[in-house]
Amino acid sequence: MPSFDFTSEADMVGLKNAIDVTSRQIDNRYDFKGTSAKVELNEKDKVITLWGDSDFQLDQIKDLLFPAMEKKEKESVKRLDHQKVVSVSGNKVKQEMKIKDGIDSDLAKKIVKLVKDGKLKVQASIQGDTVRVQGAKRDDLQGCIALITKSITDFPIKYGNFRD
């Protein structure tokens, strides 16, 4: 019975590359000279930290970072969970953005419900942070992929692990 999985995993190599590109742009820009503007990635905790002198500067850093991220992985900005801007020593500010990885249980339940309501001849089951979809025909599975990618637009979902 053919099957595939819906997953949502961040491309950490592409993300690290986008942050390196942004750091180089910050170093080269005239308006960032002599400021504390920088971008850091904590791969272990999956957190991006933006440092700057003001909220405006954080917005400028985001304007550099987000297109670089989108270039590496489409819709990757949607997986960021923006935390509050925090004042740190002196007049500096920082903002953390957590990288949401995997499909949480609420989204998995939503996917299963959409598949069942779509009246396709497939079965969806939640397996940890993935959703496995099984069906008798490949055409049904392709219809399921089209339904889910059209319905869920607020979070980047990938499909793979096709089996015959």
UniProtKB/Swiss-Prot annotation:
GO cellular component, one term: cytosol
Annotated signal sequence range: none
GO MF terms, alphabetically ordered: nucleotide binding
Nucleotide-binding as UniProt keyword: yes
Entry-linked CDD domains: YajQ_like
InterPro entries: DUF520, UPF0234-like_C, UPF0234_N, YajQ-like_sf
Pfam families: DUF520
Gene3D superfamilies associated with the record: 3.30.70.860, YajQ-like, domain 2 (3.30.70.990)
Keywords carried by this UniProt record: Nucleotide-binding
SUPFAM superfamilies recorded: YajQ-like
Family note: Belongs to the YajQ family.
Described purpose of this protein according to its UniProt entry: Nucleotide-binding protein.
PANTHER family (alphabetical): UPF0234 PROTEIN YAJQ (PTHR30476:SF0)
Name the UniProt record assigns to this protein: Nucleotide-binding protein Daro_3028
Lineage: Bacteria, Pseudomonadati, Pseudomonadota, Betaproteobacteria, Rhodocyclales
